[in-house]
């Protein structure tokens, strides 16, 4: 039996790191929900996994901007409505601005902070109540620079 058999994992982001995590979790038997502000990224991640043979019933995509707590809460609630639990949060959503620091605007910097830091806070805050209620849950935060 796989370690994540019938476990539900919510992954923030739908890029390469999120997809790699999803593949590993799917191999272990998990159901995986991606949340991302880009519908195109969600569609690409899910269609790519389906094309590789993964069961679409074990996949879910939710449009969600992690900068907004209400959207993270709605994403968590959508997962709970479909599968009844969230066992693990894997926070991978993040952005980088490719420009010299002395050319970066305050707005660009704030966007990085809002997604890479505040977004993690929002995602964690949105799943903790259901994890506390079940007295079970794992939170993994992945970042890179």
What is each PLM-predicted segment?
Residues 2-33:
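Canonical Rossmann dinucleotide-binding motif of NAD(H)/NADP(H)-dependent dehydrogenases/reductases
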Residues 39-40, 63-74, 106:
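The beta1-alpha1 cofactor-binding region of Rossmann-like NAD(H)/NADP(H)-dependent oxidoreductases
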Residues 124-125:
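A short, exposed helix-loop element centered on a Lys and neighboring polar residues
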Residues 100-101, 108-110:
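Substrate-binding pocket helix/loop in short-chain dehydrogenase/reductase
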Residues 92-97:
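Conserved NAD(P)H cofactor-binding loop of Rossmann-fold oxidoreductase domains
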Residues 30-44:
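Conserved glycine-rich Rossmann-like NAD(P)H-binding loop of the short-chain dehydrogenase/reductase
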Residues 144:
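Residue(s) in the substrate-gating loop at a strand-loop-helix junction
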């Amino acid at each position: 039996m796989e370690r994540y058999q019938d476990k539900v994992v919510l992954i923030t982001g739908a890029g390469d790191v999120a997809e790699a995590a999803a593949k590993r979790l799917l191999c272990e038997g998990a159901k995986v929900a991606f949340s991302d502000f880009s519908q195109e990224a969600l569609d690409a991640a899910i269609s790519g996994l389906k094309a590789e043979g993964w069961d679409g019933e074990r996949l879910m995509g939710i449009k969600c901007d992690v900068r907004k707590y209400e959207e993270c809460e709605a994403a968590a609630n959508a997962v709970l409505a479909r599968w009844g639990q969230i066992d693990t949060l894997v926070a991978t959503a993040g952005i980088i601005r490719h420009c010299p620091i002395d050319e970066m605007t305050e707005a660009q910097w704030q966007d990085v902070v809002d997604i890479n830091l505040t977004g993690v806070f929002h995602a964690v805050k949105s799943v903790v109540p259901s994890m506390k209620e079940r007295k079970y849950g794992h939170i993994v935060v992945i970042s890179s620079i």
